[in-house]
Amino acid sequence: MNRIHAVILDWAGTTVDFGSFAPTQIFVEAFRQAFDVEITLAEARVPMGLGKWQHIEALGKLPAVDARWQAKFGRAMSAADIDAIYAAFMPLQIAKVVDFSSPIAGVIDTIATLRAEGIKIGSCSGYPRAVMERLVPAAAGHGYCPDHWVATDDLAAGGRPGPWMALQNVIALGIDAVAHCVKVDDAAPGISEGLNAGMWTVGLAVSGNEFGATWDAYQTMSKEDVAVRREHAASKLYAAGAHYVVDSLADLPGVIAHINARLAQGERP
């Protein structure tokens, strides 16, 4: 059948952890713990979607963070420094990720709708396996259990923005064509991952990292503030090449219906 056979879903900010707060807060704590260097939550969000070692490396290259680092140590951040921050990050993230394992509103119903249509549920994450081994069973306890998952350090080729985690899902799920897959993510590296894998891509503008609000804050936010944040997030996701941008995973079934119509007309990603 010339239709969508699988979706490949990100985790934090896409299916669990509205606003993607688990990783961002831990980066701030890890920099402070390892080197007594302060970074802001906004800075911690900038490279979101990359593997966590690569995320720390990218943070060290942000001009403001690099300036603070140079002022304190008289040199740029080194690979050994990144290793030290990562060593601080990992136990903090492993300990706290279960506190951010609840599915985002609409996720459970959306997964049920997709499965009723015969669509398989793949997933991948910028989290390493040690973190995913805590997160996956915790999310399952809340009712979210994808058919497959891949961690950022599982594959020798690497993680995002490369296509490998998405393609590993294709193999594991037995999907016959990447054009029959949709990659869904709330951050630009995950959109690039899907494009590099030859898939349709859907960005999430409200539930994730770029919007950057807790569920409670979002619920009490003015329509004007929501619109401004949504536009900011959507512009970044479209700039990354997303075929579609919607608010959250709850909007995905409608997008898939649209993609199926395009596939039936012979279109490809």
From Swiss-Prot:
Gene Ontology biological-process entries: DNA repair; organic phosphonate catabolic process
Xref: CDD domains: HAD_PHN
Pfam entry (one): Hydrolase
InterPro entries named in the record: HAD-like_hydrolase_sf (IPR050155), HAD-like_sf (IPR036412), HAD-SF_hydro_IA (IPR006439), HAD_sf (IPR023214), PGP-like_dom2 (IPR023198), Phosphonoacetald_hydro (IPR006323)
Regions that span the bilayer: none
Cofactor annotation remark: Binds 1 Mg(2+) ion per subunit.
E.C. designation(s): 3.11.1.1
Cofactor entry: Mg(2+)
SUBUNIT field: Homodimer.
Function in brief: Involved in phosphonate degradation.
HAMAP family: PhnX
Protein name: Phosphonoacetaldehyde hydrolase
Upper taxonomic lineage: Bacteria, Pseudomonadati, Pseudomonadota, Gammaproteobacteria, Enterobacterales
Gene for this chain: phnX
